[in-house]
Amino acid sequence: MKILMPYFKRYRLDVWIAMLSVIVLVFATLWQPRLLQVIMEAIIKNDQAMVFREGLMLLGLAVLGIIGGIVNTIYAARVALGVATDLRADLYAKVQSLAYADVEKFSPSNLVVRMTNDINQVQQIVMAGFQQITRIPLLFIGALILAVMTMPEQWWVIVVMMAVILGVALIAVRRMTKYFAQTQQDIENVNTVARENLMGIRVVKSFVQEPNEIKKFSAASDELTAVTAKIGYWFAILMPAFFLTANVAVGVAVYLVGQTITTHPAYLASITSFISYLMQILFAVINGGFLMTFASRAVISLGRIGEVMTTEPSMTYVDGDAAPVAGDIHFDHVTFTYPGDAQPTLKDVTFTVKAGSMLGIVGATGSGKTTLAQLIARLYDPDSGTVSIGGIDVRALPEKALRSTVAYVLQRSTLFSGTIAGNLRQVKPDAQPSHMQWAANIAQSAEFIERLPQTYDAPVEERSQNFSGGQKQRLAITRGVIANPEILILDDATSALDARSEKLVQEALDRELKSTTTVVIAEKIASIIRADQILVLDNGRISGQGTHHELLQDSAIYRAIYQTQKAREEGLHE
Protein backbone atom coordinates (compact mmCIF):
# COMPACT_ATOMS: atom_id res chain seq x y z
CA MET A 1 0.00 0.00 0.00
CA LYS A 2 3.02 2.26 0.32
CA ILE A 3 2.91 2.88 -3.41
CA LEU A 4 -0.56 4.46 -3.06
CA MET A 5 0.21 6.93 -0.25
CA PRO A 6 1.59 9.71 -2.51
CA TYR A 7 -1.58 9.46 -4.60
CA PHE A 8 -3.86 9.70 -1.56
CA LYS A 9 -2.07 12.90 -0.55
CA ARG A 10 -3.07 14.48 -3.85
CA TYR A 11 -6.72 13.95 -2.91
CA ARG A 12 -6.51 14.56 0.84
CA LEU A 13 -9.63 16.76 0.96
CA ASP A 14 -11.71 14.11 -0.82
CA VAL A 15 -10.22 11.47 1.49
CA TRP A 16 -11.23 13.41 4.61
CA ILE A 17 -14.74 14.07 3.33
CA ALA A 18 -15.17 10.38 2.47
CA MET A 19 -14.00 9.31 5.94
CA LEU A 20 -16.05 11.91 7.85
CA SER A 21 -19.20 11.10 5.88
CA VAL A 22 -18.84 7.41 6.67
CA ILE A 23 -18.59 8.26 10.37
CA VAL A 24 -21.92 10.08 10.05
CA LEU A 25 -23.37 7.03 8.30
CA VAL A 26 -22.13 4.66 11.03
CA PHE A 27 -23.49 6.89 13.81
CA ALA A 28 -26.92 6.95 12.17
CA THR A 29 -26.84 3.19 11.57
CA LEU A 30 -25.88 2.36 15.17
CA TRP A 31 -28.35 4.66 16.84
CA GLN A 32 -31.44 3.56 14.88
CA PRO A 33 -31.90 0.21 16.72
CA ARG A 34 -31.56 2.04 20.03
CA LEU A 35 -34.34 4.45 19.09
CA LEU A 36 -36.40 1.51 17.82
CA GLN A 37 -36.04 -0.12 21.24
CA VAL A 38 -37.24 3.08 22.93
CA ILE A 39 -40.22 3.24 20.56
CA MET A 40 -41.09 -0.40 21.33
CA GLU A 41 -40.96 0.32 25.06
CA ALA A 42 -43.20 3.38 24.53
CA ILE A 43 -45.69 1.26 22.57
CA ILE A 44 -45.80 -1.28 25.41
CA LYS A 45 -46.46 1.60 27.85
CA ASN A 46 -48.96 3.16 25.39
CA ASP A 47 -47.02 6.46 25.49
CA GLN A 48 -48.11 7.95 22.12
CA ALA A 49 -46.24 11.23 22.64
CA MET A 50 -42.93 9.42 23.06
CA VAL A 51 -43.69 7.19 20.05
CA PHE A 52 -44.25 10.29 17.89
CA ARG A 53 -41.17 12.13 19.23
CA GLU A 54 -38.81 9.16 18.94
CA GLY A 55 -40.30 8.26 15.55
CA LEU A 56 -39.38 11.69 14.19
CA MET A 57 -35.85 11.24 15.53
CA LEU A 58 -35.65 7.81 13.88
CA LEU A 59 -36.77 9.31 10.57
CA GLY A 60 -34.20 12.11 10.90
CA LEU A 61 -31.43 9.58 11.63
CA ALA A 62 -32.43 7.56 8.56
CA VAL A 63 -32.23 10.67 6.35
CA LEU A 64 -28.88 11.61 7.91
CA GLY A 65 -27.56 8.11 7.19
CA ILE A 66 -28.72 8.30 3.56
CA ILE A 67 -27.00 11.66 3.10
CA GLY A 68 -23.81 10.32 4.69
CA GLY A 69 -23.89 7.28 2.42
CA ILE A 70 -24.41 9.35 -0.74
CA VAL A 71 -21.60 11.79 0.15
CA ASN A 72 -19.29 8.91 1.03
CA THR A 73 -19.97 7.12 -2.28
CA ILE A 74 -19.36 10.28 -4.32
CA TYR A 75 -16.06 11.17 -2.66
CA ALA A 76 -14.82 7.58 -2.44
CA ALA A 77 -15.41 7.34 -6.19
CA ARG A 78 -13.53 10.62 -6.74
CA VAL A 79 -10.54 9.32 -4.80
CA ALA A 80 -10.58 5.91 -6.52
CA LEU A 81 -10.91 7.37 -10.01
CA GLY A 82 -8.26 10.02 -9.38
CA VAL A 83 -5.77 7.57 -7.88
CA ALA A 84 -6.33 5.06 -10.71
CA THR A 85 -5.96 7.74 -13.39
CA ASP A 86 -2.76 9.15 -11.89
CA LEU A 87 -1.30 5.70 -11.23
CA ARG A 88 -2.04 4.61 -14.80
CA ALA A 89 -0.42 7.77 -16.18
CA ASP A 90 2.67 7.31 -13.99
CA LEU A 91 2.92 3.63 -14.89
CA TYR A 92 2.72 4.49 -18.58
CA ALA A 93 5.38 7.18 -18.15
CA LYS A 94 7.56 4.66 -16.30
CA VAL A 95 7.23 2.16 -19.16
CA GLN A 96 8.28 4.90 -21.57
CA SER A 97 11.39 5.56 -19.48
CA LEU A 98 12.48 1.91 -19.52
CA ALA A 99 15.09 0.64 -21.91
CA TYR A 100 14.05 -1.47 -24.88
CA ALA A 101 15.47 -4.57 -23.14
CA ASP A 102 13.39 -3.86 -20.02
CA VAL A 103 10.18 -3.67 -22.05
CA GLU A 104 11.06 -6.93 -23.79
CA LYS A 105 11.70 -8.56 -20.40
CA PHE A 106 8.16 -7.83 -19.20
CA SER A 107 6.66 -8.30 -22.70
CA PRO A 108 4.23 -5.77 -24.21
CA SER A 109 1.08 -7.83 -23.52
CA ASN A 110 2.12 -8.25 -19.88
CA LEU A 111 2.55 -4.49 -19.51
CA VAL A 112 -0.83 -3.83 -21.14
CA VAL A 113 -2.53 -6.07 -18.54
CA ARG A 114 -0.74 -4.21 -15.74
CA MET A 115 -1.85 -0.84 -17.11
CA THR A 116 -5.46 -1.95 -17.53
CA ASN A 117 -6.66 -4.94 -15.51
CA ASP A 118 -4.31 -4.45 -12.56
CA ILE A 119 -5.08 -0.73 -12.34
CA ASN A 120 -8.81 -1.57 -12.40
CA GLN A 121 -8.30 -3.96 -9.47
CA VAL A 122 -6.59 -1.18 -7.52
CA GLN A 123 -9.37 1.27 -8.38
CA GLN A 124 -11.99 -1.16 -7.08
CA ILE A 125 -10.21 -1.77 -3.77
CA VAL A 126 -9.63 1.96 -3.22
CA MET A 127 -13.32 2.59 -3.84
CA ALA A 128 -14.35 -0.23 -1.50
CA GLY A 129 -11.73 0.78 1.02
CA PHE A 130 -12.94 4.34 1.46
CA GLN A 131 -16.50 3.10 1.69
CA GLN A 132 -15.76 0.29 4.15
CA ILE A 133 -12.32 0.65 5.74
CA THR A 134 -13.60 3.15 8.32
CA ARG A 135 -17.16 1.86 8.39
CA ILE A 136 -16.37 -1.78 9.16
CA PRO A 137 -14.33 -1.35 12.40
CA LEU A 138 -16.56 1.44 13.73
CA LEU A 139 -19.74 -0.49 12.95
CA PHE A 140 -18.32 -3.72 14.36
CA ILE A 141 -17.09 -2.20 17.63
CA GLY A 142 -20.15 0.00 18.09
CA ALA A 143 -22.65 -2.77 17.36
CA LEU A 144 -20.76 -5.20 19.61
CA ILE A 145 -20.80 -2.80 22.56
CA LEU A 146 -24.44 -1.83 22.08
CA ALA A 147 -25.51 -5.47 21.63
CA VAL A 148 -23.85 -6.45 24.91
CA MET A 149 -25.36 -3.41 26.62
CA THR A 150 -28.80 -4.33 25.27
CA MET A 151 -28.74 -7.99 26.34
CA PRO A 152 -25.62 -8.70 28.43
CA GLU A 153 -26.61 -12.33 29.06
CA GLN A 154 -26.34 -13.15 25.33
CA TRP A 155 -22.71 -12.09 24.82
CA TRP A 156 -21.59 -15.66 24.17
CA VAL A 157 -23.99 -15.94 21.18
CA ILE A 158 -22.12 -13.06 19.54
CA VAL A 159 -18.70 -14.59 20.25
CA VAL A 160 -19.64 -18.00 18.78
CA MET A 161 -21.18 -16.38 15.67
CA MET A 162 -18.05 -14.27 15.09
CA ALA A 163 -15.70 -17.21 15.59
CA VAL A 164 -17.53 -19.34 13.01
CA ILE A 165 -17.75 -16.55 10.43
CA LEU A 166 -14.12 -15.47 10.84
CA GLY A 167 -12.93 -19.08 10.60
CA VAL A 168 -14.78 -19.63 7.33
CA ALA A 169 -13.57 -16.27 5.97
CA LEU A 170 -9.90 -16.96 6.78
CA ILE A 171 -10.00 -20.38 5.13
CA ALA A 172 -11.63 -18.88 2.04
CA VAL A 173 -9.18 -15.98 1.78
CA ARG A 174 -6.21 -18.34 2.06
CA ARG A 175 -7.54 -20.54 -0.74
CA MET A 176 -8.68 -17.70 -2.99
CA THR A 177 -5.45 -15.68 -2.85
CA LYS A 178 -3.55 -18.21 -4.97
CA TYR A 179 -6.45 -18.31 -7.43
CA PHE A 180 -6.38 -14.53 -7.80
CA ALA A 181 -2.67 -14.65 -8.68
CA GLN A 182 -3.34 -17.38 -11.24
CA THR A 183 -6.23 -15.35 -12.69
CA GLN A 184 -3.94 -12.43 -13.53
CA GLN A 185 -1.49 -14.77 -15.26
CA ASP A 186 -4.29 -16.44 -17.22
CA ILE A 187 -5.65 -13.05 -18.32
CA GLU A 188 -2.18 -12.26 -19.69
CA ASN A 189 -2.13 -15.58 -21.55
CA VAL A 190 -5.52 -14.91 -23.14
CA ASN A 191 -4.41 -11.41 -24.17
CA THR A 192 -1.17 -12.75 -25.64
CA VAL A 193 -2.92 -15.41 -27.74
CA ALA A 194 -5.53 -12.93 -28.98
CA ARG A 195 -2.91 -10.29 -29.76
CA GLU A 196 -0.69 -12.73 -31.68
CA ASN A 197 -3.67 -13.97 -33.68
CA LEU A 198 -4.91 -10.51 -34.62
CA MET A 199 -1.43 -9.22 -35.43
CA GLY A 200 -0.84 -12.20 -37.69
CA ILE A 201 -4.34 -12.51 -39.10
CA ARG A 202 -3.06 -12.55 -42.70
CA VAL A 203 -0.85 -15.54 -41.98
CA VAL A 204 -3.71 -17.27 -40.18
CA LYS A 205 -6.01 -16.74 -43.16
CA SER A 206 -3.34 -17.66 -45.71
CA PHE A 207 -2.59 -21.04 -44.13
CA VAL A 208 -6.19 -21.73 -43.07
CA GLN A 209 -5.16 -21.88 -39.41
CA GLU A 210 -8.46 -20.60 -38.00
CA PRO A 211 -9.38 -23.97 -36.37
CA ASN A 212 -5.96 -24.27 -34.70
CA GLU A 213 -6.09 -20.67 -33.52
CA ILE A 214 -9.58 -21.20 -32.11
CA LYS A 215 -8.32 -24.27 -30.24
CA LYS A 216 -5.35 -22.33 -28.88
CA PHE A 217 -7.54 -19.45 -27.72
CA SER A 218 -10.14 -21.82 -26.27
CA ALA A 219 -7.45 -23.62 -24.27
CA ALA A 220 -6.19 -20.34 -22.78
CA SER A 221 -9.74 -19.16 -22.16
CA ASP A 222 -10.71 -22.48 -20.53
CA GLU A 223 -7.81 -22.18 -18.09
CA LEU A 224 -9.00 -18.69 -17.12
CA THR A 225 -12.58 -19.94 -16.81
CA ALA A 226 -11.53 -22.86 -14.59
CA VAL A 227 -9.67 -20.63 -12.14
CA THR A 228 -12.45 -18.02 -12.14
CA ALA A 229 -14.99 -20.77 -11.48
CA LYS A 230 -13.03 -21.90 -8.41
CA ILE A 231 -13.19 -18.35 -7.07
CA GLY A 232 -16.92 -18.33 -7.81
CA TYR A 233 -17.39 -21.61 -5.91
CA TRP A 234 -15.80 -20.12 -2.80
CA PHE A 235 -17.97 -17.01 -3.05
CA ALA A 236 -21.00 -19.29 -3.44
CA ILE A 237 -20.06 -21.07 -0.20
CA LEU A 238 -19.26 -17.93 1.78
CA MET A 239 -22.58 -16.09 1.61
CA PRO A 240 -24.85 -19.00 2.62
CA ALA A 241 -22.41 -19.97 5.39
CA PHE A 242 -22.38 -16.44 6.78
CA PHE A 243 -26.15 -16.01 6.73
CA LEU A 244 -26.79 -19.51 8.09
CA THR A 245 -24.54 -18.72 11.04
CA ALA A 246 -26.28 -15.38 11.61
CA ASN A 247 -29.76 -16.91 11.43
CA VAL A 248 -28.79 -19.64 13.87
CA ALA A 249 -27.42 -16.96 16.23
CA VAL A 250 -30.65 -14.96 15.95
CA GLY A 251 -32.74 -18.09 16.52
CA VAL A 252 -30.74 -19.01 19.62
CA ALA A 253 -31.07 -15.47 20.98
CA VAL A 254 -34.85 -15.40 20.38
CA TYR A 255 -35.25 -18.80 22.01
CA LEU A 256 -33.30 -17.79 25.09
CA VAL A 257 -35.20 -14.52 25.41
CA GLY A 258 -38.48 -16.41 25.04
CA GLN A 259 -37.48 -18.57 28.01
CA THR A 260 -36.98 -15.51 30.21
CA ILE A 261 -39.69 -13.15 28.88
CA THR A 262 -42.02 -13.86 31.80
CA THR A 263 -39.42 -12.79 34.35
CA HIS A 264 -37.92 -9.97 32.23
CA PRO A 265 -40.73 -8.27 30.22
CA ALA A 266 -38.35 -5.50 29.12
CA TYR A 267 -36.56 -8.05 26.93
CA LEU A 268 -39.54 -7.95 24.54
CA ALA A 269 -38.47 -4.47 23.40
CA SER A 270 -34.78 -5.35 23.58
CA ILE A 271 -34.93 -8.38 21.31
CA THR A 272 -35.57 -6.29 18.17
CA SER A 273 -32.65 -4.02 18.99
CA PHE A 274 -30.41 -6.99 19.82
CA ILE A 275 -31.21 -8.73 16.52
CA SER A 276 -30.48 -5.49 14.62
CA TYR A 277 -27.08 -5.26 16.29
CA LEU A 278 -26.40 -8.92 15.52
CA MET A 279 -27.12 -8.23 11.85
CA GLN A 280 -24.86 -5.16 11.94
CA ILE A 281 -22.05 -7.26 13.42
CA LEU A 282 -22.68 -9.84 10.73
CA PHE A 283 -22.65 -7.12 8.05
CA ALA A 284 -19.33 -5.79 9.36
CA VAL A 285 -17.73 -9.24 9.48
CA ILE A 286 -19.02 -10.27 6.03
CA ASN A 287 -17.92 -7.02 4.42
CA GLY A 288 -14.60 -7.29 6.22
CA GLY A 289 -14.17 -10.79 4.80
CA PHE A 290 -15.01 -9.66 1.29
CA LEU A 291 -12.75 -6.64 1.65
CA MET A 292 -9.92 -8.97 2.71
CA THR A 293 -10.64 -11.18 -0.30
CA PHE A 294 -10.63 -8.33 -2.79
CA ALA A 295 -7.69 -6.75 -1.00
CA SER A 296 -5.66 -9.93 -1.51
CA ARG A 297 -6.34 -9.65 -5.24
CA ALA A 298 -5.52 -5.94 -5.23
CA VAL A 299 -2.29 -6.59 -3.31
CA ILE A 300 -1.22 -8.96 -6.08
CA SER A 301 -2.06 -6.30 -8.67
CA LEU A 302 -0.24 -3.63 -6.65
CA GLY A 303 2.78 -5.90 -6.45
CA ARG A 304 2.78 -6.31 -10.22
CA ILE A 305 2.43 -2.55 -10.69
CA GLY A 306 5.14 -1.90 -8.11
CA GLU A 307 7.45 -4.33 -9.90
CA VAL A 308 7.35 -2.07 -12.95
CA MET A 309 7.40 1.20 -11.00
CA THR A 310 10.49 0.17 -9.01
CA THR A 311 12.38 -1.24 -11.99
CA GLU A 312 15.47 0.81 -12.60
CA PRO A 313 16.11 1.30 -16.32
CA SER A 314 18.96 -0.96 -17.41
CA MET A 315 20.15 1.89 -19.60
CA THR A 316 20.67 5.46 -18.39
CA TYR A 317 21.68 8.63 -20.17
CA VAL A 318 23.87 11.54 -19.19
CA ASP A 319 22.48 15.05 -19.07
CA GLY A 320 23.57 17.46 -21.74
CA ASP A 321 22.88 19.30 -24.96
CA ALA A 322 20.40 17.88 -27.47
CA ALA A 323 22.46 18.99 -30.46
CA PRO A 324 23.36 16.14 -32.86
CA VAL A 325 26.95 14.97 -33.20
CA ALA A 326 28.96 14.08 -36.32
CA GLY A 327 27.92 10.99 -38.27
CA ASP A 328 31.07 8.85 -38.21
CA ILE A 329 30.63 5.43 -36.54
CA HIS A 330 33.22 3.24 -34.84
CA PHE A 331 32.83 -0.24 -33.34
CA ASP A 332 35.79 -1.28 -31.20
CA HIS A 333 35.89 -5.02 -30.35
CA VAL A 334 32.15 -5.14 -29.62
CA THR A 335 30.58 -8.30 -28.20
CA PHE A 336 26.89 -8.51 -27.36
CA THR A 337 24.60 -11.19 -25.93
CA TYR A 338 20.83 -10.86 -25.69
CA PRO A 339 19.46 -11.23 -22.14
CA GLY A 340 18.74 -14.89 -21.48
CA ASP A 341 20.85 -16.18 -24.38
CA ALA A 342 23.81 -18.44 -23.73
CA GLN A 343 25.84 -17.44 -26.80
CA PRO A 344 26.72 -13.92 -27.97
CA THR A 345 25.01 -12.61 -31.09
CA LEU A 346 27.92 -10.32 -32.01
CA LYS A 347 31.50 -11.37 -31.38
CA ASP A 348 34.49 -9.02 -31.34
CA VAL A 349 33.14 -6.72 -34.08
CA THR A 350 35.40 -3.84 -35.15
CA PHE A 351 34.88 -1.40 -38.04
CA THR A 352 34.77 2.32 -38.85
CA VAL A 353 32.38 4.31 -41.05
CA LYS A 354 33.22 7.82 -42.22
CA ALA A 355 30.62 10.55 -41.87
CA GLY A 356 28.55 11.01 -45.02
CA SER A 357 29.40 7.58 -46.43
CA MET A 358 27.20 4.56 -47.04
CA LEU A 359 27.64 1.30 -45.15
CA GLY A 360 25.97 -1.86 -46.41
CA ILE A 361 25.47 -4.91 -44.20
CA VAL A 362 24.65 -8.38 -45.52
CA GLY A 363 24.62 -11.85 -44.06
CA ALA A 364 22.47 -14.87 -43.43
CA THR A 365 19.42 -14.74 -41.18
CA GLY A 366 20.56 -14.64 -37.55
CA SER A 367 24.05 -13.39 -38.40
CA GLY A 368 23.60 -10.24 -36.26
CA LYS A 369 22.74 -7.57 -38.84
CA THR A 370 19.80 -6.03 -36.98
CA THR A 371 21.59 -6.40 -33.65
CA LEU A 372 24.46 -4.31 -34.98
CA ALA A 373 22.03 -1.59 -36.05
CA GLN A 374 20.33 -1.66 -32.64
CA LEU A 375 23.68 -1.04 -30.95
CA ILE A 376 24.24 2.03 -33.15
CA ALA A 377 20.83 3.37 -32.08
CA ARG A 378 21.61 2.27 -28.50
CA LEU A 379 18.58 0.11 -28.03
CA TYR A 380 21.03 -2.16 -26.23
CA ASP A 381 24.49 -1.69 -24.74
CA PRO A 382 27.33 -4.07 -25.65
CA ASP A 383 28.72 -6.58 -23.16
CA SER A 384 32.22 -5.43 -23.99
CA GLY A 385 33.87 -2.99 -26.36
CA THR A 386 32.58 0.44 -27.35
CA VAL A 387 30.23 1.87 -29.95
CA SER A 388 31.14 5.46 -30.81
CA ILE A 389 29.37 8.13 -32.85
CA GLY A 390 31.18 11.33 -33.71
CA GLY A 391 34.12 10.07 -31.68
CA ILE A 392 31.96 9.79 -28.52
CA ASP A 393 30.93 6.57 -26.80
CA VAL A 394 27.14 6.34 -27.27
CA ARG A 395 26.86 5.73 -23.50
CA ALA A 396 28.27 9.22 -22.98
CA LEU A 397 25.73 10.90 -25.27
CA PRO A 398 22.56 12.57 -23.91
CA GLU A 399 19.45 10.75 -25.10
CA LYS A 400 18.10 13.70 -27.09
CA ALA A 401 21.47 14.18 -28.77
CA LEU A 402 21.56 10.51 -29.78
CA ARG A 403 17.96 10.52 -31.05
CA SER A 404 18.52 13.71 -33.05
CA THR A 405 21.64 12.14 -34.57
CA VAL A 406 20.30 8.68 -35.46
CA ALA A 407 17.10 7.85 -37.35
CA TYR A 408 16.17 4.16 -37.43
CA VAL A 409 13.73 2.81 -40.07
CA LEU A 410 12.68 -0.81 -39.55
CA GLN A 411 11.55 -3.41 -42.07
CA ARG A 412 8.29 -3.83 -40.18
CA SER A 413 7.02 -0.28 -40.44
CA THR A 414 5.13 0.97 -37.40
CA LEU A 415 2.82 3.93 -37.95
CA PHE A 416 0.69 5.32 -35.14
CA SER A 417 -3.02 5.95 -35.51
CA GLY A 418 -3.78 9.59 -36.21
CA THR A 419 -2.67 11.39 -39.37
CA ILE A 420 0.30 11.24 -41.70
CA ALA A 421 1.36 14.69 -40.50
CA GLY A 422 1.07 13.54 -36.88
CA ASN A 423 3.44 10.65 -37.56
CA LEU A 424 5.97 12.93 -39.24
CA ARG A 425 5.80 15.46 -36.40
CA GLN A 426 6.79 12.75 -33.93
CA VAL A 427 10.31 13.21 -35.27
CA LYS A 428 10.14 16.90 -36.17
CA PRO A 429 7.45 18.62 -34.05
CA ASP A 430 7.75 21.91 -35.96
CA ALA A 431 7.54 20.27 -39.40
CA GLN A 432 5.80 22.48 -41.94
CA PRO A 433 4.12 21.25 -45.16
CA SER A 434 7.28 22.15 -47.09
CA HIS A 435 9.39 19.90 -44.82
CA MET A 436 6.91 17.07 -45.22
CA GLN A 437 6.87 17.39 -48.99
CA TRP A 438 10.68 17.42 -49.13
CA ALA A 439 10.90 14.22 -47.06
CA ALA A 440 8.06 12.58 -49.00
CA ASN A 441 9.81 13.30 -52.30
CA ILE A 442 12.92 11.52 -51.02
CA ALA A 443 10.93 8.48 -49.84
CA GLN A 444 8.80 8.44 -53.01
CA SER A 445 5.67 8.71 -50.85
CA ALA A 446 4.56 12.09 -52.22
CA GLU A 447 2.99 10.45 -55.26
CA PHE A 448 0.32 8.62 -53.24
CA ILE A 449 0.03 11.10 -50.33
CA GLU A 450 -0.88 13.94 -52.66
CA ARG A 451 -3.57 11.80 -54.30
CA LEU A 452 -5.34 11.47 -50.95
CA PRO A 453 -8.22 13.95 -50.39
CA GLN A 454 -6.64 15.26 -47.16
CA THR A 455 -3.02 14.78 -48.31
CA TYR A 456 -0.78 15.03 -45.21
CA ASP A 457 -3.79 15.30 -42.90
CA ALA A 458 -5.10 11.98 -44.19
CA PRO A 459 -5.95 9.55 -41.37
CA VAL A 460 -3.76 6.64 -40.37
CA GLU A 461 -5.99 3.87 -39.06
CA GLU A 462 -5.09 1.49 -36.25
CA ARG A 463 -2.08 -0.61 -37.33
CA SER A 464 -2.08 1.56 -40.50
CA GLN A 465 -4.44 -0.91 -42.19
CA ASN A 466 -5.46 1.68 -44.79
CA PHE A 467 -1.98 1.57 -46.39
CA SER A 468 -0.21 -1.19 -48.30
CA GLY A 469 3.11 -2.66 -47.17
CA GLY A 470 5.06 -0.57 -49.67
CA GLN A 471 3.21 2.61 -48.71
CA LYS A 472 3.89 1.98 -45.02
CA GLN A 473 7.60 1.51 -45.72
CA ARG A 474 7.74 4.73 -47.72
CA LEU A 475 5.91 6.62 -44.97
CA ALA A 476 8.35 5.20 -42.42
CA ILE A 477 11.30 6.36 -44.55
CA THR A 478 9.62 9.78 -44.86
CA ARG A 479 9.46 9.97 -41.07
CA GLY A 480 13.08 8.86 -40.81
CA VAL A 481 14.52 11.50 -43.15
CA ILE A 482 12.32 14.50 -42.28
CA ALA A 483 14.68 15.72 -39.53
CA ASN A 484 17.71 15.33 -41.84
CA PRO A 485 19.62 13.07 -39.40
CA GLU A 486 23.37 12.65 -39.28
CA ILE A 487 22.94 8.85 -39.39
CA LEU A 488 20.11 7.04 -41.18
CA ILE A 489 19.67 3.32 -40.55
CA LEU A 490 17.53 1.43 -43.07
CA ASP A 491 16.98 -2.06 -41.66
CA ASP A 492 15.70 -3.83 -44.77
CA ALA A 493 13.36 -0.83 -44.97
CA THR A 494 12.83 -1.07 -48.74
CA SER A 495 12.02 -4.78 -48.91
CA ALA A 496 8.36 -4.12 -49.82
CA LEU A 497 9.23 -1.64 -52.60
CA ASP A 498 9.42 -2.54 -56.26
CA ALA A 499 12.82 -2.22 -57.97
CA ARG A 500 11.95 1.12 -59.58
CA SER A 501 10.76 2.73 -56.32
CA GLU A 502 13.77 1.39 -54.42
CA LYS A 503 16.13 2.84 -57.03
CA LEU A 504 14.39 6.22 -56.88
CA VAL A 505 14.65 6.24 -53.06
CA GLN A 506 18.37 5.43 -53.20
CA GLU A 507 19.02 8.16 -55.77
CA ALA A 508 17.05 10.71 -53.72
CA LEU A 509 18.96 9.79 -50.57
CA ASP A 510 22.27 10.26 -52.39
CA ARG A 511 21.12 13.59 -53.79
CA GLU A 512 19.36 15.16 -50.79
CA LEU A 513 21.24 13.66 -47.82
CA LYS A 514 24.82 13.99 -49.01
CA SER A 515 26.21 14.62 -45.51
CA THR A 516 24.18 11.83 -43.88
CA THR A 517 25.84 8.53 -42.99
CA THR A 518 23.57 5.80 -44.34
CA VAL A 519 23.59 2.30 -42.87
CA VAL A 520 21.65 -0.11 -45.09
CA ILE A 521 20.83 -3.65 -43.98
CA ALA A 522 19.62 -5.65 -46.94
CA GLU A 523 18.88 -9.15 -48.10
CA LYS A 524 19.45 -8.11 -51.73
CA ILE A 525 22.98 -7.17 -52.68
CA ALA A 526 21.51 -4.90 -55.36
CA SER A 527 20.35 -2.61 -52.53
CA ILE A 528 23.90 -2.01 -51.27
CA ILE A 529 26.02 -2.48 -54.40
CA ARG A 530 26.86 1.27 -54.41
CA ALA A 531 27.92 1.34 -50.76
CA ASP A 532 31.31 2.84 -49.89
CA GLN A 533 31.85 -0.10 -47.55
CA ILE A 534 30.06 -3.42 -47.08
CA LEU A 535 30.22 -5.68 -44.03
CA VAL A 536 29.58 -9.39 -44.43
CA LEU A 537 28.40 -10.92 -41.14
CA ASP A 538 28.61 -14.63 -40.46
CA ASN A 539 27.48 -16.03 -37.11
CA GLY A 540 28.07 -12.72 -35.35
CA ARG A 541 31.51 -12.03 -36.77
CA ILE A 542 32.71 -9.88 -39.67
CA SER A 543 33.85 -12.36 -42.31
CA GLY A 544 34.33 -9.79 -45.06
CA GLN A 545 34.75 -6.03 -45.37
CA GLY A 546 35.21 -3.81 -48.41
CA THR A 547 33.49 -2.55 -51.55
CA HIS A 548 31.32 -4.70 -53.77
CA HIS A 549 34.15 -5.44 -56.20
CA GLU A 550 36.64 -6.13 -53.41
CA LEU A 551 34.31 -8.58 -51.71
CA LEU A 552 33.62 -10.43 -54.94
CA GLN A 553 37.34 -11.17 -55.00
CA ASP A 554 38.00 -11.72 -51.28
CA SER A 555 34.81 -13.04 -49.63
CA ALA A 556 33.52 -16.49 -50.51
CA ILE A 557 30.30 -15.89 -48.53
CA TYR A 558 29.58 -12.59 -50.30
CA ARG A 559 30.38 -14.09 -53.67
CA ALA A 560 28.06 -17.03 -53.01
CA ILE A 561 25.20 -14.70 -52.00
CA TYR A 562 25.75 -12.52 -55.07
CA GLN A 563 25.92 -15.43 -57.48
CA THR A 564 22.81 -17.05 -55.99
CA GLN A 565 20.81 -13.83 -56.28
CA LYS A 566 22.14 -13.15 -59.78
CA ALA A 567 21.21 -16.63 -60.95
CA ARG A 568 17.73 -16.22 -59.48
CA GLU A 569 17.24 -12.90 -61.31
CA GLU A 570 18.49 -14.37 -64.59
CA GLY A 571 16.12 -17.28 -64.17
CA LEU A 572 13.21 -14.90 -63.74
CA HIS A 573 14.06 -13.09 -66.97
CA GLU A 574 14.32 -16.24 -69.09
Segments predicted by a language model, with ranges:
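An intracellular "coupling" helix at the cytosolic face of ABC transporter transmembrane type-1 domains
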Residues: 12, 97-101, 117-126, 130, ...
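Hydrophobic alpha-helical transmembrane segments of ABC transporter permease domains
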Residues: 28, 32, 48-50, 56, ...
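Short intracellular "coupling" helices and adjacent cytoplasmic loop segments at the cytosolic face
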Residues: 45, 81, 89-113, 117-119, ...
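Helix-loop-helix
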Residues: 47, 146-160, 230-304, 308-309
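ABC-type nucleotide-binding domain
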Residues: 324-574
